[in-house]
Structure formats: C-alpha cells, structure tokens
C-alpha cells in the first residue's frame, strides 16, 4: 500500500485563481493523451453501466422505453419548431415519475462509484506529470489498487447526494457538486475514509470559498466547451474538470509525495 503525505514544493500553485488555473492547464496539456484515453473509457463505461443498471432497477426500464418512444415520434414527425421541441420536453417530463427519479439516482450513483477509481487515475497522472515523474499507462488504474473501497464508497455517497439534490432543486445539486470537488484527491492521496474525505472537502472548500467557486465554475465551463464543436470536442475538453481537482487540492493542501508505509 502506498501512502501520500503533504509537503511544500515549488510545483505547488499559489492559492490564487490565475496560478491554479495556469497549473491546471499545464497539467491538462502535459497529460493530454492519457486524458483522451481516460475520457473514452470513462464515457463508454458510464453509458454502458448506467444504461444496463437503469433496466434492472424498478421503473428504469419503463422510462427508457418511454423515452425511446417519444424520441421516435419526434423524429418521425419531422417537426423541429419551438412548439414541437416544447411538446417533446413536456412528454419527457411527464414520463419522469418518482420511481424513475429514484432509479436514476441509484443507477448514476452505482455507475459513478464503479468509475471513481478511474477518475483517481487521471488525478494521479496529473500528480506524476507535475512532479516530473515518469507516467505509465497503468497509472490510470491506480485507483483500483489503492484505497479502492473508500474511493468507491466516496463516489457512491457523493453522487447519490448530488443527484438527489438536483432532483429537488438544481442549485442544491450544484452546491453539493462544488462542496465535494476536492474530496476524491483527499481520499486517495491522504489514504483516508470516504466520510473523512467528505468532511474535509466541505471544510476546505468553504475556507477557500471564492477561489474554489470561481475555479469550479471555470472548470465546468471549459469541460463543457466541447459541446460547441459537434459534441466530439467533449472528448478533448471533458478531462479538464478532473485535472483541475488536483491543482486546487495541491494549492490548498500542498503537493503530495509518495512514501513507503
């Protein structure tokens, strides 16, 4: 088992928005090929896992079938004006029963939990690059070898809370996503429990509220920018949301280094 501890190193960005953003971009561009592999694996696995789980959870399969029926009717009608789009939106909303909402929360939580170790991998690769250490393809899967159970638990709990929050009110879900933003690096680098990662992330995020909020918003905007390029661009911009986590974490907590247990 590898552990990590905190030290102050020159590679650690200052607790300033510009410094952290520059640090994140440097890591992102330096690990781009690994990030591209990561996002392909992540998105494929996410849609496969989430799709399969939705059919096995009560209410999920019926909703998927209803969505497919509504979308087929929309395409066959060949009416793409504002009224048709509004009608489509209303039909999809009508199909979202309470059972469907619960099934989505469960399926997305399980999917995110299973993929959380992969997210840790891209965070760890950012660390390796930043520390001028050799990066290997196997580093992408380190989350499946170290503190895996707690990483998975963290992924499940936080996603369940975020998804439930989004169902209640979008602002609640967004706030929870923001509050949990650096919890995963904490669980991994500090080899701690999921609950401790949640607690410490809340504490540190609120202690550095404005800085983290601005960076969280910018990371989200940059990661979503690929949608403007026929969706394909998401493959190139999506990983930035995850590499930014390491930069924010290292600015607040100090850059970790590997030690023997």
Regions of interest found by a model, annotated:
Residues 1-23, 255-261:
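Low-complexity, intrinsically disordered extramembrane tails and loops of integral membrane proteins
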Residues 2-4, 97-131, 159-195, 223, ...:
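Selective recognition of hydrophobic, aromatic-rich stretches within alpha-helical transmembrane segments
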Residues 11, 147, 168-170:
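Short, charged helix-to-loop "capping" segments that act as catalytic/coupling loops
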Residues 14-45, 137-164, 178-227:
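Interfacial aromatic "cap" segments that immediately flank transmembrane helices
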Residues 14-127, 131, 150:
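Short, small/hydrophobic-residue-rich motifs at membrane-helix boundaries and re-entrant hairpins
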Residues 47-54, 62, 66, 148, ...:
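Alpha-helix boundary/capping detector
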Residues 71-86, 186, 190-211, 250-261:
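Alpha-helical transmembrane segments and their immediate juxtamembrane interface regions
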